UniProtKB/Swiss-Prot annotation:
Protein name as it appears in the record: Zinc metalloprotease Rip1
Any one biological process term the GO annotation gives: proteolysis
Enzyme class: hydrolase
Species the sequence originates in: Mycobacterium bovis (strain BCG / Pasteur 1173P2)
InterPro entries associated with the record: PDZ (IPR001478), PDZ_6 (IPR041489), PDZ_sf (IPR036034), Pept_M50_Zn (IPR004387), Peptidase_M50 (IPR008915)
SMART domains: PDZ
Entry's family note: Belongs to the peptidase M50B family.
Cofactor list: Zn(2+)
PDZ domain location: 121-203
Taxonomic path: Bacteria, Bacillati, Actinomycetota, Actinomycetes, Mycobacteriales
Length: 404
């Protein structure tokens, strides 16, 4: 029951985020003298609407977004006589840019508010964990009897028996230098027998011989990344974990901006990698293992939201919503039509072009002909809609689950 409740709550939170995005456009458009014809939440048939002043407000049947209809957003629109002087495309560049940025800006504001609240209540995670092979804990070596499921074991493991402690930094496994925990684990998996391992402890290099223990682990087979059971070496160590840091009312402010900046970099990397994830999504639809690093749709996001609520992980619920708003802001600022960033790029281009013409003693040129940009816009739309359908299908037939 809580899982379904979580799905509904997260879907509602997404809808509110989109509604606030459009509200940002509407509020700034009004403040700068433009006419807002309609403000609707959802698409499709109208369920309810009312008119206040010159704006019609309403709710439509399909709760998958919303829109804010500003008069004269492009020169190709039909305008009523009272709209001609207030048409958006005729306004000063700074006004147009302000209106267009207000939507993504609202999503960014939501992200900042949520991250600030998380910093106060739960603390912020460290996006830059230790890059060295720092040992966090030692223990026995358990067999992975099935994917993600370890059998019970007791007693010290090979690392502990050899004298390796929590806080030690592994720098070499046999003849292989390692600079991260993943590199260390990979080197151990390939080893067997008694292997010299070099660790740094309090600035001193210590060589200790560790008896590598054979065990079963599920690892990628190298052909499409499918996980398969394999016999590998293990020494019974875990990576050092850096817990979240809680902040006060004032210290949380710079921490929020710093964390959001780091998160934006990660979001940018993820967006740049989208084309490389198509194959993994297709394999997931065909019944293969779903890569948790593949992108998700609104459907997948709501399922993850349901998982977080079902297990009482409200911090994950709000953090995921903050991250989603940051993604919405970032995508909408891409300088491609039909995104807000594409319209901003057109407005800035017109401004620079007319400044150059003015410097040459020429009059301002006509606004950009959006009809000539339609082919490029349609290409972007086809790619975006196609990718959305791919992710929705993958989320329906093979969703990413936090707990299974």
């Amino acid at each position: 029951m809580m899982f379904v409740t979580g799905i509904v709550l997260f879907a509602l939170a997404i809808l509110i985020s989109v509604a606030l995005h459009e509200c940002g456009h509407m509020w700034v458009a009004r403040r700068t003298g433009m006419k807002v014809r309609r403000y609707f939440v959802g698409f499709g048939p109208t369920l309810w609407s009312t008119r206040r002043g010159e704006t019609e407000y309403g709710v439509k049947a399909v709760p998958l977004g919303g829109f804010c209809d500003i008069a004269g957003m492009t020169p190709v629109e039909e305008l009523d006589p009272d709209e001609r002087d207030r048409a958006m495309y005729k306004q000063a560049t700074w006004k147009r840019v302000a209106v267009l940025f207000a939507g993504p800006g609202m999503n960014l504001a939501i992200c900042l508010v949520l991250i600030y609240a998380i910093a106060l209540v739960w603390g912020l995670p460290n996006l830059h964990p230790p890059t060295r092979a720092v040992i966090g804990e030692t223990g026995c070596v358990a067999q992975e009897v099935s994917q993600g499921k370890l059998e019970q074991c007791t007693g010290p493991g090979p690392a502990a028996l050899a004298g390796i402690r929590s806080g030690d930094v592994v720098v070499k496994v046999g003849d292989t230098p390692v600079s991260s925990f993943d590199e260390m684990a990979a080197a151990v998996r390939k080893s067997h027998g008694s292997v010299p391992i070099v660790v740094e402890r309090d600035g001193t290099a210590i060589v200790t011989y560790v008896d590598i223990e054979s065990t079963q682990r599920w690892i990628p087979n190298g052909q499409g990344g499918e996980l398969q059971p394999a016999t590998v070496g293990a020494i019974g160590v875990g990576a050092a974990r850096v817990g979240p840091v809680r902040y006060g009312v004032f210290s949380a402010m710079p921490a929020t901006f710093a964390f959001t900046g780091d998160l934006t970099v990660e979001v940018g990397k993820a967006l740049a990698a989208l084309p490389t994830k198509v194959g993994a999504l297709v394999r997931a639809i065909g019944g293969g293992q779903r890569d948790p690093q593949t992108p998700i749709s609104v459907v997948g996001a709501s399922i993850i939201g349901g998982d977080t609520v079902d297990h009482g992980l409200w911090v994950a619920f709000w953090f995921f919503l903050a991250q989603l708003n940051l993604i919405l802001a970032t995508i909408n600022l891409l300088p491609l039509l039909p995104f807000d960033g594409g319209h901003i790029a057109v407005a800035v281009f017109e401004r620079i072009r007319n400044m150059v013409r003015s410097a040459r003693g020429k009059v301002a040129a006509a606004p950009v002909n959006y009809l000539k940009l339609l082919p490029a816009t349609y290409v972007v739309l086809v790619l975006v809609v196609g990718y959305m359908l791919l992710t929705v299908t993958a989320d329906l037939v093979n969703p990413i689950r936090l707990f299974q």
